[in-house]
Amino acid sequence: MAQLGAVVAVASSFFCASLFSAVHKIEEGHIGVYYRGGALLTSTSGPGFHLMLPFITSYKSVQTTLQTDEVKNVPCGTSGGVMIYFDRIEVVNFLVPNAVYDIVKNYTADYDKALIFNKIHHELNQFCSVHTLQEVYIELFDQIDENLKLALQQDLTSMAPGLVIQAVRVTKPNIPEAIRRNYELMESEKTKLLIAAQKQKVVEKEAETERKKALIEAEKVAQVAEITYGQKVMEKETEKKISEIEDAAFLAREKAKADAECYTAMKIAEANKLKLTPEYLQLMKYKAIASNSKIYFGKDIPNMFMDSAGSVSKQFEGLADKLSFGLEDEPLETATKEN
C-alpha cells in the first residue's frame, strides 16, 4: 500500500507539472511562436491562454506593437580621422502580425539584433566615413535621423517585409574635448556676431522708422499748408466774386438811377412843353400881377396886358423848346422879371 501511494503521488505530481507547463499565456500586442525539438512550427497564436505538449514544445512571445530599440555607444570615424561616439540611437518600429512567422524563421525571435542593431552600426559608419567632423557634428546633423530611417526601411523592405521603421532619433555625438571647446568658442563668437548683426538691424530699423516718421510729418505739414493755401485762394476768389457782384449791383443801381432821372427830366420837359401854352402863360401873368402888391401908374400900364403878352409867350415857347432837348432852363420868375 505504501508503494502504491508513492506511485500515485509521483504520478499526480508529474501530471500537475505537465499541465502547468502545457498551459501558457500570450499578452495583448504579441504573437506566440512554437518550437518542437528545436524546429519552428508553422502554427502561431494570438493573445490569451493556450495549450501545448509539455516538455517537448516551447514557445516565445513576439511583440507586434510599437517598440523602441536602443543602440548605445556607437563608434564612428569621420573622413578627417576623428573618432566620435553616439551615446544612444533610438529606433521606433513595429512588426506586422502576418509577417511574424517568416521573420522569426529567417532571423530568429531576436530579429532586431540582426536587422536593426547591426544595420544601424553599418549605416552610421558609412555616413561618417564620407563626411567631415564639421558636417557630422553641425551642418548635416539634422539629416542623420531621416537618412538612417530611409536606409533601414529600404533594406528591410527587401530583406524582411513586414518590419516597419516608424522613426529614428540620434543624440548629439561625443567628440574630443579639445575639439568640443573649439566648437563652443566658435559658437560663442557666432552668437556674438549674430547679436551684433541683430543690434545693427535694430538700429537700422529705428533709423528707418524715424526717417519714415519725419517723412510722414513733412507730408502732413505740406498737406496742411496746401489745404490752408487752397482755403486762402478760395477766400480771395470768393471776395473777388462778392466785390464783382457788389460792383455790378452798384453799377446797375446807378444806371437805373440815371435812367430814372433822365426819364423824369424828359417827362418834365415834355410836361412843361405841353403846359407852357399862350393861354397858360397869360393866366400865370394875371396871377402874378394879381398877387403883386405894388402897382405902378403910367401910360404903359394898359399895354402891359396887351403887348407884352405876345412877347412873353414867344419867349416861353423858346424856353420850352430848349427844355425838350435837355438843355439847362432858366427859372420862370427870372424870365418874367426880365420882361
UniProtKB/Swiss-Prot annotation:
It is found in: Endoplasmic reticulum membrane. Pfam families: Band_7 (PF01145). One of its GO terms (molecular function) is cholesterol binding. Keywords: Acetylation, Cholesterol metabolism, Disease variant, Endoplasmic reticulum, Glycoprotein, Hereditary spastic paraplegia, Lipid metabolism, Membrane, Neurodegeneration, Signal-anchor, Steroid metabolism, Sterol metabolism, Transmembrane, Transmembrane helix. Residues 25-339 are lumenal. The modification N6-acetyllysine is found at residue 267. One of its GO terms (biological process) is SREBP signaling pathway. The chain crosses the membrane at residues 4-24. Signal peptide: none annotated. GO terms for cellular component: cytosol; endoplasmic reticulum; endoplasmic reticulum membrane; membrane raft; plasma membrane; protein-containing complex. InterPro entries: Band_7, Band_7/SPFH_dom_sf, Erlin1/2. Ubiquitous. Glycans are attached at residue 106. Belongs to the band 7/mec-2 family. Component of the ERLIN1/ERLIN2 complex which mediates the endoplasmic reticulum-associated degradation (ERAD) of inositol 1,4,5-trisphosphate receptors (IP3Rs) such as ITPR1. Promotes sterol-accelerated ERAD of HMGCR probably implicating an AMFR/gp78-containing ubiquitin ligase complex. Involved in regulation of cellular cholesterol homeostasis by regulation the SREBP signaling pathway. May promote ER retention of the SCAP-SREBF complex. It is linked to Spastic paraplegia 18B, autosomal recessive: A form of spastic paraplegia, a neurodegenerative disorder characterized by a slow, gradual, progressive weakness and spasticity of the lower limbs. Rate of progression and the severity of symptoms are quite variable. Initial symptoms may include difficulty with balance, weakness and stiffness in the legs, muscle spasms, and dragging the toes when walking. In some forms of the disorder, bladder symptoms (such as incontinence) may appear, or the weakness and stiffness may spread to other parts of the body. Forms a heteromeric complex with ERLIN1. In complex with ERLIN1, interacts with RNF170. Interacts with activated ITPR1, independently of the degree of ITPR1 polyubiquitination. Interacts with SCAP, INSIG1, SREBF1 and SREBF2 under cholesterol sufficiency conditions; indicative for an association with the SCAP-SREBP-INSIG complex. Probably part of an AMFR/gp78 and INSIG1-containing ubiquitin ligase complex involved in ERAD of HMGCR. Interacts with TMUB1; TMUB1 bridges the association with AMFR. Interacts with SYVN1 and RNF139. Interacts with TMEM259. Interacts with TMEM41B. This is Erlin-2. The lineage of its organism: Eukaryota, Metazoa, Chordata, Craniata, Vertebrata. The gene is ERLIN2.
